[in-house]
């Protein structure tokens, strides 16, 4: 049975002090109620070190929001996998739709970043998902298939990879794919993984849902057989809401 995983992506929110406070509040809100679920939080780069100190003695994992595909060099504004590993990150989010939309990330650069992160010993959350236009024009499966196949190109072992399905039209909009809609895509992704890596690997890979997950809909989403947790945006900025989502995944 796959252990569910819930990660709070704080995006470009919170100062270092605010991140420390939120991490403290998250630990308090979680209490002992998440033993059945893997939990991570992803603050900004600036707050990684300070946040790590707060969660160091807990089971909550430190996650980075991105990393570059080179170790160092003339890449102004970028941060390498080695750098985030050095401050205590165990995982990194790669290919988030906002990176693709606003910063020109492609399947090819996502693939490079994944390979570098894996080579440094990090776990990876690979984000895939379609826009509303792509869904309505009937190319959703083509888009997601390309993101999965090209993102994982040349990667033999996916045991350290989690896939996050994030319908772009549901991110930060308040709209949520129904549990049936989300399950349909998660099953499609798992079928893709079966074709690429075989049945055993596809049964083990965890596929998160990310798209306006809230305490009010988390339990229904997480009850679906192919939804293995969530990549949480806005709701992760409220400790009580995030804890409620984690507990819904811990049942």
UniProtKB/Swiss-Prot annotation:
Under the cellular component aspect of Gene Ontology, which terms does the record hold? cytosol
Task: Quote the InterPro entries the UniProt record gives.
Answer: Aldolase_TIM, TIM_sf, TrioseP_Isoase_bac/euk, Triosephosphate_isomerase, Triosephosphate_isomerase_AS
GO BP terms: gluconeogenesis; glyceraldehyde-3-phosphate biosynthetic process; glycerol catabolic process; glycolytic process
**Which source organism?**
Pelodictyon phaeoclathratiforme (strain DSM 5477 / BU-1)
Report the protein name in the record.
Triosephosphate isomerase
For this protein, the record's CDD domains field holds: TIM
Enumerate the GO terms in the molecular function aspect: triose-phosphate isomerase activity
Which HAMAP family does the UniProt entry name for this protein? TIM_B
Q: Subunit info?
A: Homodimer.
The gene behind this protein is tpiA
Q: What does this protein do?
A: Involved in the gluconeogenesis. Catalyzes stereospecifically the conversion of dihydroxyacetone phosphate (DHAP) to D-glyceraldehyde-3-phosphate (G3P).
Top EC group? isomerase
What family, per the record?
Belongs to the triosephosphate isomerase family.
Specify the pathway: Carbohydrate biosynthesis; gluconeogenesis; Carbohydrate degradation; glycolysis; D-glyceraldehyde 3-phosphate from glycerone phosphate: step 1/1
Taxonomic classification: Bacteria, Pseudomonadati, Chlorobiota, Chlorobiia, Chlorobiales
Query: Which residues are involved in binding substrate?
Result: 9-11, 172, 212, 233-234
Residues the record marks as active site:
96, 166
Query: Mind listing the UniProt keywords for this protein, alphabetically?
Result: Cytoplasm, Gluconeogenesis, Glycolysis, Isomerase
Q: Where does the UniProt annotation locate this protein?
A: Cytoplasm
Pfam families with a match to the protein in the record: TIM (PF00121)
Chief location:
cytoplasm
Its UniProt entry gives the catalysed reaction(s) as: D-glyceraldehyde 3-phosphate = dihydroxyacetone phosphate
PROSITE patterns, per database record: TIM_1 (PS00171), TIM_2 (PS51440)
Q: Which domain of life is it from?
A: Bacteria
Q: What is its EC number?
A: 5.3.1.1
């Amino acid at each position: 049975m796959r252990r569910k995983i819930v990660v709070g992506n704080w995006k470009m929110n919170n100062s270092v002090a605010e991140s420390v406070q939120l991490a403290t509040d998250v630990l308090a809100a979680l209490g002992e109620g998440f033993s059945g679920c893997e939990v991570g939080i992803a603050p900004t780069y600036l707050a990684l070190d300070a946040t790590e100190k707060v969660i160091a003695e807990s089971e909550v994992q430190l996650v980075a929001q991105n990393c570059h595909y080179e170790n160092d060099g003339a890449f102004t504004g970028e941060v390498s996998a080695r750098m985030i590993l050095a401050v205590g990150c165990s995982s990194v989010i790669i290919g988030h739709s906002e990176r693709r939309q606003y910063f020109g990330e492609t399947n090819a650069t996502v693939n490079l970043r994944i390979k570098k992160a894996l080579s440094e010993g990090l776990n990876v959350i690979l984000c895939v998902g379609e826009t509303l236009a792509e869904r309505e024009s009937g190319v959703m499966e083509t888009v997601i298939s390309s993101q999965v196949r090209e993102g994982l190109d040349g990667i033999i072992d996916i045991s350290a990879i989690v896939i996050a399905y994030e319908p772009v039209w549901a991110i930060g909009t308040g709209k949520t794919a129904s549990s049936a809609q989300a399950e349909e895509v998660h099953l499609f992704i798992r079928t893709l993984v079966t074709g690429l890596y075989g049945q055993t690997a596809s049964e083990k890979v965890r596929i998160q849902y990310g798209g306006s997950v809230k305490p009010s809909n988390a339990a229904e989403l997480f009850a679906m057989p192919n939804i293995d947790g969530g990549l949480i945006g806005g709701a992760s900025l409220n400790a009580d809401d995030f804890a409620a989502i984690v507990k819904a995944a811990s049942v």
